[in-house]
Amino acid sequence: MAKALVVLLLTLVPAAHAARSGDEGRWSVQCAAVYASAYGLPVELVDAVIQVESGWNRYAVSNKGAAGLMQLMPATALRFGVRDRFDVEDNIRGGVAYLAWLIRLFQGDLRLALAAYNAGESLVLLRGLDLSSPEIVGYVDHVTQVYRALRTQAPRKRELVNSMSGTRGG
């Protein structure tokens, strides 16, 4: 069902072809909104993860080998069907699928899900939110702060999603 919704929503994006070639930033924002909706996540959360992970740089590569907008590790990309970690849509789809999976795995605990996104689910399943790791706690706090800030701008984001899906309201 989610896949059909994504296909439908992406066909409704009026500037999809132009966006792919001419307006990469707009295409990235549209993909984030569409996949957030398809996976039942707040678009502001997806945007916050992208902002913190890569600063919206599709070619970002970490010193640990994570790549693309949502900084997917090779094994995570493979597990979630991402063929090209530098492809905007492929990376966002895989990253949002992974984030949604983590939120379910940690029974809605966003802090644990974000810690797992940063450090891997095995470590978080073993230790929880390891308060002795300033890097992990700092990451969770940073994404949470950006998420809260973006939620104050939510009405504008909802208008974008609604214009793409042909719905009204918020």
Regions inferred by a protein language model and the residue ranges of each:
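Catalytic glycan-binding domains that act on GlcNAc-containing polysaccharides
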Residues: 19-170
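Sec-dependent signal peptide recognition
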Residues: 1-8
